[in-house]
Amino acid sequence: MGEYAAIEKEAKLFTELCVHNDAIDPNLFDEFGVKRGLRDKDGNGVLAGITNISRIDAFEMRDGVKTPCDGKLWYRGYNVYDLIRGLRGKRYGFEEVAYLLLLGDLPNEQQLHEFTDCLTKCRALPSNFVRDVIMKAPSKDLMNSLTRSVLTLASYDDSVGDNSLQTQMEQCIKLISVFPMLAVYGYHAYNYYLNDGSMYIHRPRPELSAAENLLQMLRPDQQYTPLEAHVLDIALLLHMEHGGGNNSTFTTRVVTSSGADTYSVIAAALSSLKGPKHGGANIKVMEMMDDIRAHVSDVTDEDEMRAYIGKIVDKEAFDHKGLVYGMGHAVDSLSDPRAVVFKSFVQQLAMAKGRKADFDFYNTVERLAPQVIAEKRHIYKGVSTNVDFYSGFVYNMLGIPVELYTPMFAVARVVGWSAHRMEELVNVDKIIRPAYKSVMATRDYLPMENRG
């Protein structure tokens, strides 16, 4: 295919026309009661559906008053904290929690063995897929690579047009199984062809968990420590699911409701997750932390740290958007339970890696940023760290390249997407179609010669 035609001049003009004609008076949104972002002024989401997969508790009723509380995240009725505590030092949790989210119950030993064996059997790509699809079209944007791979897999599936629930379940399980390979192999192709790096393709090993296989496929020597694998496993578990209203999961529901096939649905969810306001947040955290280090002469000086964080909030520093990335969440209020649980594992890994000073730096920002935000902004609820604040730091300590940060999120969240797709198919047979209020003025048709 040839190069795209250069239309920079025309595009500039078209953009100016678009901005002029598309601008809507912001007051109209309030006048018509529009919930922008499908959220009210307090940040609460518009009720769009019912789910039995997960729940986030950010508020509780006290004397009849809705009051912010420390967050709790429930997977199929189980507190995520209890799920992780039950795994501590015993086994990896990705497969067990995937079973729980997808099928609704915690597996017994035999059920877990059968499910894990099923994932292992599906952990294979079609013949020459890596060569013909991943290697021949490497991309620096690994989310694009991942999305393309998912859509291409549909052409290898003879049952793609079969709408039975059993076929949808089979396709979901297969995608959950191969996502680690698609992500890691996509990175190796990029690193070799576009980054002048080395390339090595390690096959997944059947006796290893998802977290272990991710590390051994990514690293040239295939070596990792139990702590590294365990912390990555916890990271995957905490990113698997976060309710039906997050952007990519709601996208899953919307596209599923149209009757689209599994591959198209998951590709749409990936496209949503790719956005920096969603799956790319941990990259922004890392960039922000690097910026703070570069502009604060002594990161142990809390007055200097507080002053620079204030500049970020005032849009005078970093990307001038006024956001302290990794702080706050659309649903959680006083705390993100994922961040609370994750922090102890982050600390363990930091100590093992000789990164205590870096952990202390993150801890300082975590403590000071909410104070600065509260001083400078009118906020409707508490501000606390979310799971994105620490996940990029963990990936960095594990030697995972930044290009893989969002794909790692996808490796975990495809489990939640699959669970929500199945729940939508089981319970709903109506396309999602919200309303938009038109505020355009009607005009009389103008013949060509009268248009000026």
Predicted segments — roles?
Residues 1-452:
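Non-transmembrane, aqueous-exposed alpha-helical and coiled segments at domain scale
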